[in-house]
């Protein structure tokens, strides 16, 4: 059994490579969950095992070329996966949906007349409340990457949890009992800055 190959280099969309070179590359179909990682292992189409150590912060997209330490080239393809497609002829409604999804830092694919997200029952309820249909299907998922920093993203649940925890902390700090001493600069009910006349 041959040793696993190591893959570290990305050539975005195969820029600068001849079409004949790209045509000879091994194809590797990956779902978004894996394309969003920098460290993973996969079995290539020729049966070899490959360990990927890619630059952090990158999201692989359909057409990227990866170069292994032995010179092998691997063409990335977006694999079909479970997605929710939001299709409409009403551009304004789609814009509203895109706004709400973006506000929650949800990876979203933008297409002509449709949006596409990963399945999420909470988001699907929101989509339907906006008057749009959420259709489950198998399709490649290629969300916009710029909106969440090239791979760094939070689910809406994580965002809510972190925001809620921060709010709780701020509230706790505000409500913490305060011992007043000579150096305290707070003014309190019943305290006066002016002298009393007796």
UniProtKB/Swiss-Prot annotation:
One GO-annotated biological process of the protein: protein folding
Subcellular location: Cytoplasm
SUPFAM superfamilies found in the cross-reference section: Urease metallochaperone UreE, C-terminal domain, Urease metallochaperone UreE, N-terminal domain
GO CC terms of this entry: cytoplasm
Cited function: Involved in urease metallocenter assembly. Binds nickel. Probably functions as a nickel donor during metallocenter assembly.
HAMAP family: UreE
Protein name: Urease accessory protein UreE
């Amino acid at each position: 059994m041959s040793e696993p190959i190591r893959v570290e280099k990305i050539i975005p969309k195969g820029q600068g490579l001849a079409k004949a070179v790209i045509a000879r590359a091994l194809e590797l179909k990956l779902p978004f969950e894996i394309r969003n990682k920098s460290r993973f292992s996969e079995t290539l189409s020729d049966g070899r095992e490959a360990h990927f150590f890619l630059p952090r912060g990158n999201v692989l997209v359909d057409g990227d070329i990866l170069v292994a330490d032995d010179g092998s080239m691997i063409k990335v393809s977006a694999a079909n996966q479970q997605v929710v497609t939001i299709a409409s002829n009403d551009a304004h409604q789609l814009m509203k949906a895109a706004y709400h999804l973006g506000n929650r830092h949800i990876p979203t694919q933008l297409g002509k007349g449709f949006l596409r997200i990963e399945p999420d029952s909470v988001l699907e309820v929101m989509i339907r409340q906006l008057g749009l249909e959420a259709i489950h299907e198998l399709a490649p998922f290629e969300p916009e990457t710029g909106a969440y920093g090239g791979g760094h993203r939070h689910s809406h649940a994580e965002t809510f949890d972190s925001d809620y925890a921060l709010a709780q902390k701020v509230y706790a700090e505000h409500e913490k009992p305060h011992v007043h001493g000579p150096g305290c600069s707070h003014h309190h009910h019943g305290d006066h800055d002016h002298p009393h006349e007796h």
